[in-house]
Amino acid sequence: MPAIVLIGAQWGDEGKGKATDLLGGRVQWVVRYQGGNNAGHTVVLPTGENFALHLIPSGILTPGVTNVIGNGVVVDPGVLLAELKGLEERGVDTERLLISADAHLLMPYHVAIDKVVERYAGSKKIGTTGRGIGPCYQDKIARQGIRVADVLDPALLAEKIEGALELKNQVLVKIYNRKALDPAEVVENLLEQADGFKHRIADARLLLNEALERNETVLLEGSQGTLLDVDHGTYPFVTSSNPTAGGASVGSGIGPTRITTVLGILKAYTTRVGSGPFPTELFDDHGAYLAKTGGEVGVTTGRARRCGWFDAVIARYATRVNGITDYFLTKLDVLSSLETVPICVGYSVDGKRTDEMPMTQSDIARAEPIYEELPGWWEDISGCRTFDELPAKARDYVLRLEDLAGAHVSCIGVGPGRDQTIVRRDVLAAR
C-alpha cells in the first residue's frame, strides 16, 4: 500500500485529529512529520471520551497502530512524558509509539528565548505559542541542535549542550537581562527525562520504508495548516516548519513517489489563531456565532480563534501547493440555522479583482473578500450518514466548495464524534 498524507488546508485547527482517528483502524502506521507541541489535535471516540493530543500522533488511540514521531518534529521531553502519562492513566496503550532518532529535542533555552523575544517584540509580535518551537528549528538549521539520539551518548550530549549555552546564555543575560542556565543542570534533567523515552528511539525512516515494502499503509499526519507553512504560508505569520505535503517526505524519510493520496482537511468556514492577515474575518454577530457554535478555542494555547466565512481562494491555493487529491470537510453542522452562507470566491486588492492568492505580504494584508451567497439550511444534520440525507441546500454548499477548491470532497464531518461522518468516496481505496 502507498503512503497517504493528511494536511490542514487553512490556518490549522481544521479537524485533522478526527480524520486520522476515522482512518486509523485501516492503517498500520501513523506518522507525525513536523511541528511540535505548538499545535493540538482533538479526538472524540464513539464512547464520548475526548482526547487532546499535542505531540503524539492521533493513531495512538487506535489499537494495533504503530505511531511514529518523525525526524521533522521537534520534541519537548517534558511534554512528551506528560502526554504519555496522561494517556496511560486513561487506559491507552502507548507501547506502539516510536521516536525517530533524528528528531530534534526542544531545550529549556529554546522556551526561554522564545518567550522573551515575543515579549520584546510588542506590537510587532507574530503570535507564537511561546513553546520554543521557532528557536529549536533555528538551531536545527544552524546545525547546533540536539537530536533525540544524542541522549544515548551522555558525553556527546554534554558537549553539545555546553557549546549551545555559551551563546544562549550570552543572549539571555546580556541582551534580555535574564538568568543564565546551568549546562550541567540542563544535561542532568534531560538524561533523567530520557530514561522515560529512550527505549522508543528508532531508525524510523528504515522501519517506515520496510513497512511500505510489506504493503502496509502509512498515514503521514501534519500539524497546523498550509497557510502556516514557513515557505507557502502568510509569511511572517507562520510556523517554523513545512506542514504542506512536501514536508511529509522530508519529515518522515519516505520518498515522494510513495505518496499517492493527499487528503486535505477543510473546515466549512475559516479560523486562525494569532496574528496575521485573514481576509474573511468576521467582527459581527456571525463571527460570534461561529466561535460559540464551533467551540473555537485553541487546543494547545487556549486562545480564542478568529472566525470568518469559507475562503475558496486559500482552498484553491492549498489544492495547488499540496497536490490535494481529496478533501475532508469538517464542521458542516456548525452552519445549520444560518439564513445565508457566504463564500469568498475572490479578493479585491486596490480595486482589482483576483481569484488567486496575492503574491506579496502587503497585497494579502489589503485583500478584501468578494462573496457569493448561498441559501442556508435550518435542519439538524448531525445524524446524517449519507450525502443524500443532507438537506438539499447543504448538499449545494458542499458541491460549490468542491467546485471552487478543485478537489473532490470525499468525507464530510457533521459532528465531533468519529461516527458523525459522511463518506462519499473511500480515500484509502487503491489509486
From Swiss-Prot:
It is found in: Cytoplasm. It is an enzyme of class 6 (ligase). Keywords: Cytoplasm, GTP-binding, Ligase, Magnesium, Metal-binding, Nucleotide-binding, Purine biosynthesis. InterPro entries: Adenylosuccin_syn_GTP-bd, Adenylosuccin_syn_Lys_AS, Adenylosuccinate_synth_dom1, Adenylosuccinate_synth_dom2, Adenylosuccinate_synth_dom3, Adenylosuccinate_synthetase, P-loop_NTPase. Its EC number is 6.3.4.4. Mg(2+) binds at D13, G40. It catalyses: IMP + L-aspartate + GTP = N(6)-(1,2-dicarboxyethyl)-AMP + GDP + phosphate + 2 H(+). It comes from the Bacteria. Plays an important role in the de novo pathway of purine nucleotide biosynthesis. Catalyzes the first committed step in the biosynthesis of AMP from IMP. This is Adenylosuccinate synthetase. It comes from Mycolicibacterium vanbaalenii (strain DSM 7251 / JCM 13017 / BCRC 16820 / KCTC 9966 / NRRL B-24157 / PYR-1).
